[in-house]
C-alpha cells in the first residue's frame, strides 16, 4: 500500500518521459512498444484533462484528482514563513515540456506537439523575466511571482531543455526567441553563480545559498556544453 498517494503532475510527466525513451530504445518492432505507447498517451491525456486548466497546469492532486496543496515542490523556507504555497511552479512546467518533447520524438502526434508548443510559449511570455535574465520560480494561480528568487540549477537546466524542446516541436523559423532566451539564461548563470569550485545553488531576496547540490552540478555540465554547441 503506498504511503503517499498524491498525484503530482511532475511525476506523471516523468513517467511519460521514461516510457517515451523506452519506446525510442526498443523500436516499433518490439512487442512492448505498443504497450509503452498506449501508457504514455494515456498519461498525456490524463495531464491534459485532469491536471490542466485555462491558465496552465496544477501541481498536486488526491487520487481522484481533487487539487491539494503542493508543499513538496514549493517548500522554500521563505514561502513557509509566509504560509504561502505555490499554485504553479516553473519546475513542473519544465518537466511537462520535457516529457512532451520526448514523446513527440518517439511518436510524432500533433496534439502532443501543440501542447508542448503551448508550454514553450508560456515559458517565453510568462515565466521568463527578461529584465532580470532569469525564470521566476514560484507563482500563484494567476502567475504572480511569489518570491524574489533565482534558482541557478533550474535556469541552467531550462537553458538546454527548453532549446531541446524548441528544436523538436517548432519549425526552424519560430525558434529564434527561444535561442536568445536560452543563451541569456546560461550566460546569466555563468556570470552570477559559476565559481572555480562548482555552481552556487540559488539566490533568494539577495542572499546567495552556497550549498553544492549534486543535480545542480550535473545540469551545469550539460547546460554549458549545450550553450557552447549553440
Placement of each model-derived feature along the sequence:
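Glycan-recognition and catalytic cores of secretory/periplasmic carbohydrate-active enzymes
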Residues: 1-230
Amino acid at each position: 500500500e503506498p504511503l503517499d498517494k498524491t498525484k503530482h503532475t511532475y511525476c506523471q510527466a516523468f513517467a511519460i518521459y521514461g516510457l517515451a525513451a523506452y519506446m525510442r530504445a526498443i523500436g516499433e518492432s518490439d512487442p512492448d512498444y505498443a504497450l509503452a505507447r498506449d501508457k504514455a498517451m494515456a498519461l498525456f491525456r490524463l495531464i491534459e484533462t485532469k491536471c490542466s486548466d485555462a491558465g496552465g497546469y496544477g501541481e498536486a492532486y488526491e487520487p481522484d484528482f481533487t487539487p491539494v496543496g503542493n508543499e513538496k515542490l514549493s517548500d522554500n523556507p521563505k514561502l513557509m514563513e509566509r504560509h504561502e504555497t505555490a499554485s504553479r511552479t516553473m519546475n513542473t512546467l519544465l518537466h511537462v515540456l520535457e516529457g512532451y518533447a520526448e514523446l513527440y520524438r518517439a511518436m510524432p502526434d500533433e496534439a502532443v506537439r501543440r501542447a508542448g508548443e503551448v508550454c514553450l510559449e508560456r515559458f517565453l511570455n510568462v515565466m521568463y523575466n527578461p529584465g532580470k535574465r532569469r525564470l521566476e520560480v514560484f507563482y500563484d494561480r494567476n502567475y504572480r511571482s511569489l518570491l524574489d528568487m533565482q534558482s541557478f540549477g533550474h535556469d541552467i537546466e531550462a537553458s538546454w531543455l527548453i532549446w531541446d524542446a524548441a528544436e523538436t516541436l517548432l519549425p526552424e523559423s519560430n525558434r529564434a526567441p527561444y535561442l536568445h532566451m536560452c543563451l541569456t539564461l546560461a550566460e546569466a548563470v555563468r556570470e552570477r553563480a559559476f565559481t572555480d569550485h562548482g555552481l552556487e545553488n540559488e539566490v533568494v531576496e539577495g542572499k546567495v545559498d552556497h550549498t553544492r547540490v549534486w543535480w545542480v552540478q550535473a545540469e551545469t555540465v550539460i547546460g554549458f556544453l549545450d550553450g557552447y554547441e549553440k
